[in-house]
Amino acid sequence: MSFQHCILGIVASAAAFGLSPASVQAGSFSISPLRADLSASAQTGALTLRNQEAAPVVVQAQAMLWEQADGQEQLTPTRDVLVNPAVFTLPANGSQLVRVALRRPADAQRELTYRLILTEVPQPASPDFTGLNVALRLSLPVFVAPSAAKAEPRLEWTADRTADGTLAITARNAGNAHARVINFSVAPAAGSAAAIPQDVTAYVLPGQARTWTLDKKHNETTSGTDWNQLRV
């Protein structure tokens, strides 16, 4: 059964369109900000890493082209973005400024998307160490605004019934900039059943789509004919 006629209107926080926390702490690091926003007039950006531990840490930084295809993330090494320094030692209880710089022109009509990958370089363990040495790896978005158009995401929502009877909700980004979906709710257009909330937290890059399948426990709830139209 197809559910193409949807009453649109995402029920989500403002973060659905790209807002994110200013900083995050992961393992022994804290990082601020959590993304870099570049443009034709602001071709460089900077992030600050802070070491919360009493021992130095070696970190490698690399820029990757960020694409999506069939709902899957694709990262490819790129020279479009310069990262400096590319390898550095983060002092004990110290900090390091990492700069990113655009090395190509911004696209006139569409946002460019990259990822800054920060990887901890594992150090040799002491002879008496018996634990698991886990290297930290973080991925931060780098966005480049179009030079001749306003950056605007535009999500188009559809719903379809899968072969096993579950509802699959798809958000297709018809805009020229990324959207960040935090959560959404699905309900029948007639309002005869309670809305089903979904927490997802995912980026939808321009021209791409993401699909979420509702848990099978909702099959019975969503099987009625009043779900021929949905509000998402």
Feature-to-residue mapping (PLM):
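Terminal connector regions
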Residues: 103-149, 219-232
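Beta-sheet-dominated interaction scaffolds and their linkers
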Residues: 26-52, 150-166, 201
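Bacterial N-terminal signal peptides
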Residues: 9-20
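Bacterial N-terminal signal peptides that target proteins for export
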Residues: 1-11
